[in-house]
């Protein structure tokens, strides 16, 4: 776990936006935890990448 942040979905101007914006509170994860959990992404040992979400799966801005 870690700190929590609020994300909002941004879509292409060509897409129709819903009446209610999609947003979710997600957890910011330690980068090394994310890197270990997702070796298929071949993340570098150090990065300025933000890793956020729930390792077990859950809501994100694409959740319907």
UniProtKB/Swiss-Prot annotation:
One of its GO terms (molecular function) is serine-type peptidase activity. Keywords: Disulfide bond, Fibrinogenolytic toxin, Hemostasis impairing toxin, Hydrolase, Protease, Secreted, Serine protease, Toxin. GO terms for biological process: proteolysis. SUPFAM superfamilies: Trypsin-like serine proteases. InterPro entries: Peptidase_S1_PA, Peptidase_S1_PA_chymotrypsin. Transmembrane segments: none annotated. Its EC number is 3.4.21.-. The keyword Secreted applies. Disulfide bonds join 5-23, 34-51. Expressed by the vanom gland. Coiled coil: none annotated. It is found in: Secreted. It is an enzyme of class 3 (hydrolase). Belongs to the peptidase S1 family. Monomer. Thrombin-like snake venom serine protease. This is Thrombin-like enzyme collinein-4. It comes from Crotalus durissus collilineatus. The lineage of its organism: Eukaryota, Metazoa, Chordata, Craniata, Vertebrata.
């Amino acid at each position: 776990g870690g700190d929590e942040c609020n994300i909002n979905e941004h879509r292409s101007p060509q897409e129709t936006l819903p009446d209610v914006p999609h947003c979710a509170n997600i957890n910011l994860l330690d980068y090394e935890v994310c890197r270990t959990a997702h070796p298929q992404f071949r993340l570098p040992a150090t990065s300025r990448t933000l890793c956020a979400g729930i390792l077990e799966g859950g809501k994100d801005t694409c959740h319907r």
